[in-house]
């Protein structure tokens, strides 16, 4: 029979438990492998089993184990995942493919996977952000990266809520990289609003940097003054204030 979503979730939970226990005693990994092999024999939806194997191997490698258990490598995770994709090329499988390739620093391959996901029905702020960061690592034109971040933020709740606000900070930095300082300021302002003004001295310092590049000198002065107020011991802020005053 085809496993229900709840059954698949329960199975993933069990295997995650094995991996957690395996950090202390590798014999638990043997039990996880045995369960996976059993699932492959009885499951009608074998792609789901291959996907879960790949997902666990990926998570295991991200934990940076001191000694890798048997063949639980990124390469093996990718091999299992592509068996799942061969059976049923679901976008969620392709997303994990992108994550594994990203972890292997195969950024071109990861970007190709993320682009497929972004053309699917599971496209989300997170998937567009993954594509943007990958393209950034490929040294693409900063404006191309911003286009992806625009799509990321367009898929966030509007106005952007605090849970999604970090994307605004990311785009602000990308706008600065693209020499679009005024747009960076707008992103910082939107972030400030999204988190109801709950920001620290570093925020004011970064927004001051954007204001300075945008030649908004009074705003730059106001922000660096606020940074100093919140953290008067940081000499960097006082040096920056002196620079702005010279303008």
Residue spans for each PLM region:
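Start-of-helix register in tetratricopeptide repeats
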Residues: 4-7, 48, 55, 90-93, ...
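Register position in tetratricopeptide repeats
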Residues: 16-20, 59-60, 103, 137-138, ...
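Canonical tetratricopeptide repeat
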Residues: 9-11, 52, 96, 130, ...
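Residue-level recognition of tetratricopeptide repeat
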Residues: 11-16, 55, 62, 99, ...
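Short coil turns that delineate tetratricopeptide repeat
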Residues: 2-5, 44, 87-89, 122-123, ...
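Canonical positions in the second alpha-helix
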Residues: 38-39, 83-84, 116-117, 152, ...
């Amino acid at each position: 029979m085809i496993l229900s979503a709840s059954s698949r979730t329960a199975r993933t939970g069990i295997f995650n438990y094995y991996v957690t226990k395996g950090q202390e005693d590798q014999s638990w990994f043997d039990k996880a492998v045995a369960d996976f092999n059993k699932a492959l024999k009885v499951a009608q939806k074998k792609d789901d089993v291959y996907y879960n194997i790949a997902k666990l191997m990926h998570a295991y490698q991200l934990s940076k184990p001191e000694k890798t258990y048997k063949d639980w490598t990124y390469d093996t995770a990718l091999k299992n995942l592509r068996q799942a994709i061969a059976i049923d090329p679901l976008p969620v499988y392709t997303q994990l493919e992108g994550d594994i390739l990203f972890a292997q620093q195969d950024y071109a391959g990861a970007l190709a996977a993320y682009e497929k996901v972004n053309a699917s029905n599971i496209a989300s702020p997170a998937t567009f952000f993954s594509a943007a960061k990958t393209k950034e690592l490929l040294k693409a034109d900063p404006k191309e990266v911003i286009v992806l971040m625009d799509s990321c933020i367009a898929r966030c709740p509007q106005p952007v809520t605090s849970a999604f606000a970090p994307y605004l900070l990311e785009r602000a930095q990308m706008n600065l990289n693209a020499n679009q300082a005024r747009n960076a300021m707008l992103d910082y302002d939107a972030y400030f609003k999204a988190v109801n003004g709950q920001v620290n001295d570093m925020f004011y310092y970064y927004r001051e940097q954007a204001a300075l590049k945008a030649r908004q000198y009074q705003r730059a002065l106001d922000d660096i003054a606020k940074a100093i107020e919140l953290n008067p011991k940081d000499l960097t802020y006082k040096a920056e204030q002196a620079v702005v005053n010279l303008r």
